Amino acid sequence: PEHLQVFQGLEVLRNNNFIRPVPQQPEVIYEIVQQKLKEYIHQQISLEKQKILHSYIAGLWEKRLTHSPQDIRLYHHLEYHYQEAGELVNMGRYKLKILMYYLNFSNELFPVLSSADIMPDDDKSRYIESNLGKFLAEVDEMMHTIKRTCGETPEVRDLEMNYLHLMGRHYIRVGEYEKGVRNILSLIEQAAEVHNRDYMLMGYKQMIYYDIQIGNTEEMKNYLEVALNLADECNYHKEMGILLRLKGLNMIM
């Protein structure tokens, strides 16, 4: 009865071309077709209620995450809804996930993403791929805004370290070594301040990759030593294996 009334109401709206179903979704989802109707509905809802609704919708999208490359389609929704909800740190987390996807570190020595991952074929994806420099500037501005608005909270510090790692890797990969190293050294410093051993290890590894690229075997040896000690302290067996392979490489360079 109540569900039936809702369904009948939706059918009336659909028959009058006010809404349409969103295809290829596991649940039944409708979207508003007419822009003026969207604007009217927005005007009827207070700003506070809009924020609550956007936060609720973001939560629904998060439940659909599969922790696979296909999640990139959901990251754009999550970034938008968290931004509209005023949850800047959550927005930033998904913006950085989008950035990581499009930087696609498949050419790195030990890639995070497979080059076989398929880029989604949509307008947003094509825009980012063809305007990467502009997108990087947007992300940089976003980080300044988040730090200015939210202050130095643990969540903001974690976001900042993630950002420094991504940007450092990117700049080193494209040969802008000065920028890249500056970001990675800043990452190591910040991670040490908050005793975040995972980010410290990420920073050390990135400096090792940089030293391989420029042939600096002595500095590489030093970073390998501190990285191996840290990985041993943390019982990170997989990381130990990677670092020992790199140590072997260092010995024959």
How should these model regions be labeled?
Residues 30, 34, 51, 55, ...:
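Start-of-helix signal in alpha-solenoid helical-repeat scaffolds, especially tetratricopeptide repeats
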Residues 63-71, 85-88, 128-135, 139-160, ...:
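Flexible helix-coil transition and linker loops at the boundaries of alpha-helical arrays
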Residues 1-127:
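Short secondary-structure boundary elements
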Residues 137, 143-144, 156-177, 182-185, ...:
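Conserved small-residue-rich
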Residues 2, 180, 192, 220, ...:
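Charged, low-complexity surface patches
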Residues 78, 97-98, 135, 139-146, ...:
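Tetratricopeptide repeat
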Residues 40, 80-84, 97-101, 116-131, ...:
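Tandem amphipathic alpha-helical repeat scaffolds
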